[in-house]
Amino acid sequence: RALGLAGRVAVSHAFCLGMVEERELEALLELLREQRIAIMTTAPGDRPTPPVRRLREAGVTVGAGSDGVRDAWTPFGNADMLERAMLVAYRNGFRTDRLLHDALDIATRDNAAVLGLTGYGLAPGDRADLVVVPGESLGEIIAMRPPRALVLSGGRVVARDGRCVL
């Protein structure tokens, strides 16, 4: 607040938000919303995770990321945002199709918002970054993590049937 950075700050990991008492959390949620501070989670398996649903309900932008790809901290990172969406859903108890869709938004659309990306989406003139997967619904895709049939970046095919074609 003192530095005038409202809307230009994102806090990564934010493990502590998964450990605070309810009264403290309410005050923090208000401050985060008021200052437009985004929270980025990796949805870790071995640490507290920010209360994603509560954050979103309070009007806080939440994104998800994988900041380690088979590195010194974990051998499990792979930078797959569909998998990250599943982990966000799993760690936060998302069970309904609506909540599973929210997990996908967190790992895609909301990340783009935090980064200030424009032309992100599926409207005419957008970048045409997309992943094509088989599935009956978004909920099924998040829960089952089907193989990636086609991956486009900037409208260019970069992977087909799970293999890089560059």
Model-derived features with residue positions:
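Short C-terminal domain-edge/linker segments immediately following a structured domain
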Residues: 41-45, 69-71, 93-98, 160-166
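Short, glycine/charged-enriched secondary-structure capping and boundary segments
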Residues: 24-27, 54-55, 77-80, 146-148
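His/Asp/Glu-enriched, well-ordered alpha-helical/loop segment
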Residues: 2-3, 36, 53-135
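Active-site/binding-pocket entry motifs
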Residues: 17, 87, 91, 157-158
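C-terminal cap of metal-dependent C-N hydrolases
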Residues: 124-166
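Alpha-helix N-cap/helix-start motif
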Residues: 21, 48, 74-78, 141
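Active-site core of metal-dependent hydrolases
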Residues: 1-50, 61, 70
